[in-house]
């Protein structure tokens, strides 16, 4: 069996069907003796260019180990499913189980956002305390 990285884009109107589609595709691979090494749902993202007048799509990535027969059946499912607007299959030398660069970048972005928001709250809390003491000093005078 060979290792593959599969990315497919689902029409944004069918985003709620992604879970069922992924379940169907993983079942197809596992029934043929294959294995899912990594499954990542990247969610709805902006496309670089419009595909069939659609500007966003729901991205899903799978790293699998499967036979050529299972892969051909999976590609047929992609081809005849109108909800899948694009797919990409890349043959890999070995199984990739680590987190993808997309998810790492997303986590870094959320961590930076949290750090950026934290000091603002701390500054405003300190500023409120100093204003209270100033107003009490002014009241004494």
From Swiss-Prot:
Gene that encodes the chain: rpsF
A GO biological process held by the record: translation
Gene3D superfamilies assigned: 3.30.70.60
Q: Which NCBIfam families match?
A: S6 (TIGR00166)
Q: Which residues form the signal peptide?
A: none
Q: Does the keyword Ribonucleoprotein apply?
A: yes
Record's family? Answer: Belongs to the bacterial ribosomal protein bS6 family.
UniProt region (Disordered), positions on chain: 96-141
Q: Name one GO cellular component term.
A: cytosolic small ribosomal subunit
Protein task: Binds together with bS18 to 16S ribosomal RNA.
Q: In which organism is this protein found?
A: Pseudomonas putida (strain ATCC 47054 / DSM 6125 / CFBP 8728 / NCIMB 11950 / KT2440)
Acidic residues composition bias: which ranges?
Answer: 125-141
Q: Which keywords does UniProt give here?
A: Ribonucleoprotein, Ribosomal protein, RNA-binding, rRNA-binding
Compositionally biased tracts (Basic and acidic residues):
103-124
What name does the UniProt record give this protein?
A: Small ribosomal subunit protein bS6
* GO molecular function per UniProt: small ribosomal subunit rRNA binding; structural constituent of ribosome
Q: Is RNA-binding among the key words of this record?
A: yes
